Amino acid sequence: MKYAGILAGGIGSRMGNVPLPKQFLDLDNKPILIHTLEKFILINDFEKIIIATPQQWMTHTKDTLRKFKISDERIEVIQGGSDRNDTIMNIVKHIESTNGINDDDVIVTHDAVRPFLTHRIIKENIQAALEYGAVDTVIDAIDTIVTSKDNQTIDAIPVRNEMYQGQTPQSFNINLLKESYAQLSDEQKSILSDACKIIVETNKPVRLVKGELYNIKVTTPYDLKVANAIIRGGIADD
């Protein structure tokens, strides 16, 4: 089976002085979360579409779905975790407890605040996860990347045509993800910033799927302005 996990666990601290977490902020008169969710509803492949959100925002999430007449029976709202990967594992545990997990089950995980993903990106994630077990959505790095450990001087300048910017979705065979996460030490888990690193840390390959430049993550006031411009310009019409 195929599952979607929408990660709505952020509290929006980088958005500044706003009354709601960023996933509930309006984008063209509709919460960002609803824009994102509508993309997944259009994909018939999914057995369940699971939204993971902070415990204190679960009721608000359900109320928002009702307000915007989102009634797809596949949608479930659960409590997120303490961080991104803990939230993903909460979704996995929920799937396991309600449906069980088969060897070929896959999950497509996606940031609730990336509302401009496309049908193509979702379908290619599903197919690549089924075929390869783990997949990341990326775009070519446009700018030169530098690394610095002391935040003052350059340590290295990697070859740009080997650099990519990670987006979401990130998609996995569920058993592969579970088993890989279980192999990590507490120290390894504490420095994870990305779900695909769970797989990389256990020396397993992750396939790349091409994203889109406009598949942005809305985390700052500037991002919100860009997102509104994308909608007004019809840039992300799928």
Swiss-Prot record:
The record marks R160, K217 as: Positions ribitol 5-phosphate for the nucleophilic attack. Belongs to the IspD/TarI cytidylyltransferase family. TarI subfamily. Pathway: Cell wall biogenesis; poly(ribitol phosphate) teichoic acid biosynthesis. It comes from Staphylococcus aureus (strain NCTC 8325 / PS 47). GO terms for biological process: cell wall organization; isoprenoid biosynthetic process; poly(ribitol phosphate) teichoic acid biosynthetic process. The record marks R14, K22 as: Transition state stabilizer. Transmembrane segments: none annotated. CDD domains: CDP-ME_synthetase. It catalyses: D-ribitol 5-phosphate + CTP + H(+) = CDP-L-ribitol + diphosphate. Heterodimer together with TarJ. It holds the Pfam family IspD. The gene is tarI. This is Ribitol-5-phosphate cytidylyltransferase 1.
